Amino acid sequence: MKDHPLPLAPAVAASLAEWHRMIAERDLAALSALLHPDAVFRSPVAHKPYPGASAVAMILSNVIEVFEGFTYHRQFASADGMNVVLEFSARVGERELKGVDLIRFDEQGRIVDFEVMIRPASALAALGEAMGRRLAAGGR
């Protein structure tokens, strides 16, 4: 992904750079340091959000293992520099997908809300099935 300056708050910019590093290395071991204790994950396959940093870390650490060829393409920021939208593509088995991560940060640069949207529906269903199998098997 090309670097494009975004109007981000300094703490958010540092956290976003660390997020991109972790994704590029497919190693989310340091994720907990980026999460607010009350962070919330909003899944594209579940109606109810998943509250708490441990739930967010567990979901993101598992989904990065399910996605193949995960790549970010474009990124956008809110005017206040506290929110980003990251467009991505990936595969789950034979299904190609496109999606966006909508991430809200606090003043310390910690993630407080992480929402994911994915299309098409067939790829989302494949992701839900793959995540279900992984979590049933113990996940991380």
Locate the predicted segments by residue.
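A solvent-exposed, acidic/Ser-Thr-rich amphipathic alpha-helical stretch
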Residues: 28-30, 34-81
